[in-house]
């Protein structure tokens, strides 16, 4: 422990002495509380003398009842006078009458268990010994036959199963005959003497009994007899295991196993694998300082009584925690066993009782691992201690990582267009509840801010509470004052990324709904159809400062996943801005242009108004001299601080003048979408230029759409101070709402364009489908080929319809159509909606099990009969049925996808949560070579070179093709430089990457580069692991669940895409046989490609190393990616499909694996139009590929099969080389997301993810120390996380918060 909290945490196996040191007393009675007095029973499970008093400072008998007696122990009832909270931490213990094996060390999945590995006996044999089924040899004694010992130490004798017992019986009989022979020798084979000898007769009798398996006999007696004569000792139950573990010499065992591994001929057979696991286990226990016999318990701890309470229900009944039932059972059986031992009961009864005790303790620790778990009254298995740790409802996830918090509330959200960017409207009732303590403190305050005495509004707390309850008029000014003191934090579930939680300054509003600023809805993914949001209040000064400086909504301009503005206006606002920035010819010219375009342009000058100032132009609009969209002229001098390329008359509209007033005065004038902030000389009529000539050639400019507005905001963010952006956005929001109202855009069914051309296409396609059916019936086509061609034909028909409708809505006829305006501006709707409204609905998908084994090779997940009608025409009954079928499938898919995507995000976070920015520069000279990502199949660009290198650091100087320096090494590649590199024709660039950062923990600033959400160098302490996981997980729900056709002909592979493909890549799942690509294992040249008539596939023969050949047979209908004479490298695709990552690692190395995963992940996301920065994918991949497995330890002290991080391995190897010792060697490993978290090095973080029991067992066996490097382990222990403000001083955080607070407008 330190001032700042816990520094590290170690877990180990508890010794009996340690259990005793925790305990405050032994529990000997199974009673809990007295049914009359309801007080805890002495020596029972709730005994006050052991666990502490039930009431603060009051003993059991009532002799002492005040704080003044604190620390005394009552003479009568022996209860210490202290606070009752100690009942949450004080423990008791139970002295067991017989040793009991800990179930975690006997039953472990995946087996073998720790005890099984230490004693080198099978998992099943341990089980049989512990549960009193079979005996184990404790000492082989002096008992030989043919010069060999009959029994081996730790051999398990099976006398119960009819099949396996013959061998054990024969061994016992052999021993008995040995005894007979020995006695015969002693008595010189005299018959009389032998008959008289009791032991001889006994040996003969036992031999007869063992010969016939039907004769019952006492195993105990036989074994006691054998022990007396030969010294061979047998044992049963946990006692026997305890004795064997006690006598185990770990040093000897360690050396023995090591020798056996060295002598092993094959390093990969099962025997060697088991030896390696044994070596690992023995070394763990040896190095941990624990003793192996502690795995068998002689006493067990009793958890504090408050952690397993008894709760009284209505009607005088009680309910109790399941743990108490387990403890009761243990105590009853333990006490019964003690009594039996005291009365010398028969061995068979004692063994049975010991077995029952073993089972009782097992069910306490892990009830579900047993074949028949202990069940309650409702036949439900009771919750054991293991169940309390595991799963979503377990201790880790329910209580330690996520807690319910005070000072919070939730309500429905409605839109609040009148709010500023950083404000939220909170209902008055909510404020009274949430801010209650602060309001009361203000109401009873007796001094003002300057320390002067003042008359309080209320004399005491009670009166203040009454005033609040009555909602007295006097309290409202106080409430207004109080809510200015601290912001509130809003959260919308599901919180998929960090923008799901933001802070706002509260404003009191009427009603019961929270009013939310319309621009933050995108970040929260909120809409106003009944969504609810939770409100939290930061209490401490640090929390308030953090909320204002970091969490405040107005600082979240860019989305962290792609660095694009996330506060772009939507819907109504876009419609308003579109209307405002639209251009029209003056009204008379507009009418004339349809009849006589040439004359209209000449006449234009007579209606072209020129203004001297902005106010003059706006006044003319208000007086209705001109319309808001009419093209007008205004002198450039009317704009004081704006710079123009020349002086003259700017050709614009009143709408654009109003729009530009929202921006800072020095921001460029936005007039033309195509030329947002560059050279605007073509928009200005110069001093000596002809106005008539200019107007004759004038073409109307496009208005601003959602896309172009986003670019403007992006530019604004780049050139302005951070506090200017939210102010501007609020002005744009206000303009948007105002002018969407003025534009009076409405919608009606008659606005939808009419379109009849489709019936001709239908006629053609129907004829083609009929023809295909004939071909199928004649046997010219298979059913699969027919199906594929039909689906293809209808898809092409729909494409034609879509093309026609696009042409229609882009025509002049529909330019003022409200629905078209909505779609064009980006406010609502798209071409697909038009196609379905006016054209045809097209093909629908149907439910299909993608995992099924399919001989046809074609996935039939589309109904082949299309829906020909549009929604305006109305659907027929069968069309309506198919349509509903498809729509419902869409709904279920969405629900399934949300759950799967959420789980994937959780796995991603767990894998990367410890990755934090550490230090400025790790000094690495390695980087990754980055090229444009192209889809090699159709040669289209997936991600440009510019997108991949912007915001990163170069490794070496970069020169263009003329050898001119573009950028030096170790410098940041900005947007401008990235453009220069791309335009200069350079194909590849080496840049710094998180994949090669040599920081021991985390990543350095230079290997990461710019922070996408601020466009500045990433700050140290940023938790990029979590941000990366959220950036990849959050858009996961937008990915499809379908396995797409790659279209067209059968034989083209159906490759898993969308969400399933991402899962396949990150979890390292092998692709199915029918979609797996064959890759070359060697570097060489394609010698020949032969068609295989038997399999209908190909044989691809590759020549390598001058005259060696290797042949790759492909599956039927495989699509080849190479041709004869091509040069191939190891890891290159020979056929289409998905590569198995493990194969790629084997033949092409880890770098190729990393590049392949980046490329494939980007392919999936970008095909869906989702942009994610490469850097985030690299952070994830670095966590999946940063481990190596030791193949040869050298002199390092590591052992074969051990998995450690690359950076640790490098450090060990370097120190070995420096000291002239033999360094270790290792191979790279790729772990899927399921296994990566458990390899993190922190047992707390791993145990809170999955496999809690296994991870804690392993950690305890090796006395693992958790250095608390990641975020989760610190959250669990209640420390500040080692990231962000958790690394700064409190004063620094508060000062920064106050500074940012001043920037509010």
UniProtKB/Swiss-Prot annotation:
InterPro entries with a match to the protein in the record: DNA-dir_RpoC_beta_prime, DNA-dir_RpoC_beta_prime_bact, RNA_pol_asu, RNA_pol_N, RNA_pol_Rpb1_1, RNA_pol_Rpb1_3, RNA_pol_Rpb1_3_sf, RNA_pol_Rpb1_4
Coiled-coil portions: none
Catalysis: reaction(s): RNA(n) + a ribonucleoside 5'-triphosphate = RNA(n+1) + diphosphate
Lineage of producing organism: Bacteria, Bacillati, Mycoplasmatota, Mycoplasmoidales, Mycoplasmoidaceae
Binding residue positions for Mg(2+): 527, 529, 531
Sample GO molecular function, one term: DNA-directed RNA polymerase activity
Entry keyword annotation includes Endoplasmic reticulum: no
Residues binding Zn(2+) 2: 922, 997, 1004, 1007
Name of this protein: DNA-directed RNA polymerase subunit beta'
Enzyme Commission number(s) of this protein: 2.7.7.6
Gene Ontology cellular component terms for the protein in this record: DNA-directed RNA polymerase complex
Keywords (A to Z) from UniProt: DNA-directed RNA polymerase, Magnesium, Metal-binding, Nucleotidyltransferase, Transcription, Transferase, Zinc
Function: DNA-dependent RNA polymerase catalyzes the transcription of DNA into RNA using the four ribonucleoside triphosphates as substrates.
Similarity section: Belongs to the RNA polymerase beta' chain family.
GO BP terms, alphabetized: DNA-templated transcription
Manner of cofactor binding, per the entry note: Binds 1 Mg(2+) ion per subunit. Binds 2 Zn(2+) ions per subunit.
Residue positions binding Zn(2+) 1: 59, 61, 74, 77
Record SUPFAM superfamilies: beta and beta-prime subunits of DNA dependent RNA-polymerase
Enzyme class per UniProt: transferase
